[in-house]
Design a protein with these regions (language model features):
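Phosphate-end processing signature that detects enzymes handling 5′-triphosphorylated RNA
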Residues: 1-143
Length: 143
């Protein structure tokens, strides 16, 4: 179950997302839900999206979901060369951290341009865990 993440992202709408590692692939299911459906989910712990609920049945075995953590990400992004630079400020479990991402159409080209960005601005590269994993690890240390 540690290879599963369920989140609800709120920006101009609410989007429930399941991310689950299956072999070498990452499965991702996204579904827009209303604020009312989200609030009901927080109250009753029943996943409102049937496809996600069915996908997690083998893990949950009828148990309800509880919200035990909040993770907020504030992102600024801008075009750079053939991609987009994104700078994230993440807040979770009494922690604030920052992350630099470079989104590109090709992996190799993006990797090359990312290395150029890091060198150009004197940034020390440090491979990071996914945000949700960092937040979960911080929560485990706290309890």
């Amino acid at each position: 179950a540690s290879e599963i993440g369920l989140r609800v992202r709120k920006s101009d709408k609410y989007v429930m997302t399941l991310k689950r590692k299956k072999g070498y692939a990452l499965q991702e299911i996204n579904e827009t839900i209303s604020e009312e459906v989200f609030q009901q989910f927080l109250k009753d712990g029943i996943i409102p999206v049937e496809e996600i609920r069915n996908e997690l049945e083998d893990v949950l075995k009828g148990q309800k979901v509880i919200n035990y953590m909040s993770l907020s990400t504030f992102r600024i992004g801008f075009p750079y060369k053939k991609g987009t630079i994104a700078i994230d400020k993440c807040k979770y479990v009494d922690t604030v951290d920052y992350e630099l991402e470079y989104e590109a159409t090709s992996y190799e080209g993006g990797k090359r341009e990312f290395v150029e960005i890091v060198r150009e601005f004197g940034i020390v590269y440090k491979k990071s865990k996914p945000k949700i994993k960092r937040a979960y690890d911080a929560l485990k240390k706290k309890i």
